[in-house]
Swiss-Prot record:
One of its GO terms (molecular function) is DNA binding. It comes from Frankia alni (strain DSM 45986 / CECT 9034 / ACN14a). Pfam families: DAC, DisA-linker. It catalyses: 2 ATP = 3',3'-c-di-AMP + 2 diphosphate. Belongs to the DisA family. One of its GO terms (biological process) is DNA repair. Homooctamer. Its EC number is 2.7.7.85. The gene is disA. InterPro entries: DisA (IPR050338), DisA_sf (IPR038331), DNA_integrity_DisA_N_sf (IPR036888), DNA_integrity_scan_DisA_link (IPR018906), DNA_integrity_scan_DisA_N (IPR003390), DNA_integrity_scanning_protein (IPR023763), RuvA_2-like (IPR010994). This is DNA integrity scanning protein DisA. ATP binds at residues 74, 92, 105-109. The keyword Membrane does not apply. SUPFAM superfamilies: RuvA domain 2-like, YojJ-like.
Length: 359
């Protein structure tokens, strides 16, 4: 799920300065040359109003040009698409009343310009040998690929453990659904695990963006681990969203789950109320029945439209499991062949779920 607009700008900027891009190559050249730099990633009337001195260039961007221009005093201004160098050796004069927590002149200017213009600004420190990015109201130090990969691999190992636990609780839920023994606790535990896995994956996606071309293998591993998780998230909520709930639609509930604090996410009672369950302390032990979305999604070659019609017609998974071929054919869009496929598919799923739980 998408985060706030500031996060989108932040990630887009990280992608633009990721290893393997011409711009990152230019920054690395500046670092290796032991010089500093102040670079504004965008140009408009507001930026122009902060610029004094220097000279206009309007030439095509290249890493070598950026490196050579950084040798001069003053800031460099690039076009918003980073394809052209607009100005160089300019003196930036931001509003001194704009708050900043930085101490060095270059970094203070960078933070103020970023806040005042709402364009990303990069400050390359000659003394500390770091690249600091100021964007969307935050400061972020760009690390090398080795440091990012180390953090990403730790997060990936955590994701693998959480995914393994998710598969266990999801398998248990499937078996309980077949036996019609599901409680609110069982269903909410799966939603909780799905949200935890999604959050870890979202963090790893940030590393993938930051790594650029160095993040290809990490991206493939993430894709493999997260296959089907987002769909499972939606179907679990649709299966157990109480009828007439004030929580709203499944999409609204998923959005609220994404916005929950880490502390609230660990509390199953709070989680249950977000999904729409109401009641006292015994809310988690209340028995509930799924509609059947999760189970029907596992039947091969069954279109989503047909799944919706089957759920609308039968109402609960238990009625679906009890339905014969003739009963299934009564649903619009379900012919004899598809009815048999659904019947056999549900029977196999029921058998395998029970076996996995007890054998």
């Amino acid at each position: 799920m998408a985060g706030p607009p500031g996060d989108d700008i932040f990630r887009a900027t990280l992608a633009a300065v990721a290893p393997g891009t011409p711009f990152r190559d230019g920054l690395e050249r500046i670092l290796r040359g032991h010089t500093g730099a102040l670079i504004v990633l965008g140009h408009d009337k507001v930026v122009e109003g902060l610029c004094t001195g220097g000279f206009e260039l309007d030439v095509e961007f290249s890493a070598t040009r950026l490196r050579e221009l950084a040798k001069m005093d003053g800031a460099i201004v690039l076009s918003s698409d980073l394809q052209r160098i607009v100005r160089a050796a300019v003196h930036l004069v931001p509003d001194p009343t704009v708050p900043t927590e930085e101490s060095g002149t270059r970094h203070r200017t960078a933070e103020r310009v970023a806040k005042q213009t709402e364009y990303p600004v990069i400050s390359v420190s000659q003394s500390m040998h770091i690249i600091a990015l100021y964007v969307a109201g935050r400061r972020y130090v760009l690390d090398g690929s080795a440091a990012i990969l180390s953090r990403a691999n730790q997060a990936l190992a955590t994701l693998e453990r959480y995914k393994l636990r998710l598969d266990e609780v999801a398998g248990t839920l499937s078996a309980l659904e077949i036996e019609d023994l599901v409680t609110v606790r069982d269903a909410i535990s799966v939603s909780q695990r799905l949200e935890m896995v999604r959050r870890i994956a979202d963090e790893i996606e940030g590393y993938v963006v930051e790594l650029g071309t160095d993040g290809r293998l990490l991206s493939l591993q993430l894709e493999e681990l997260m296959a089907g998780v987002e769909t499972e998230r939606e179907l679990t909520v649709r299966d157990y969203l109480p009828a007439g709930s004030k929580a709203g639609s499944a999409a609204q509930v998923l959005s609220e789950l994404s916005a929950m604090s880490p502390t609230d996410l660990l509390d199953l009672t709070v989680l249950a109320r977000v999904i729409g369950f109401s009641g006292g302390a015994d809310i988690l032990d209340r028995q509930i029945s799924p509609r059947g979305y999760r189970m029907l999604a596992k039947v091969p070659r069954l279109p989503r439209m047909v799944v919706d019609r089957l759920v609308d017609h039968f109402g609960t998974l238990q009625k679906l499991l009890a339905a014969g071929v003739d009963d299934l054919q009564a649903v619009d869009g379900v012919g004899e062949t598809r009815a048999r496929a659904v019947r056999e598919g549900l029977s196999r799923l029921a058998e395998s779920s029970i076996l996995e739980r007890y054998v």
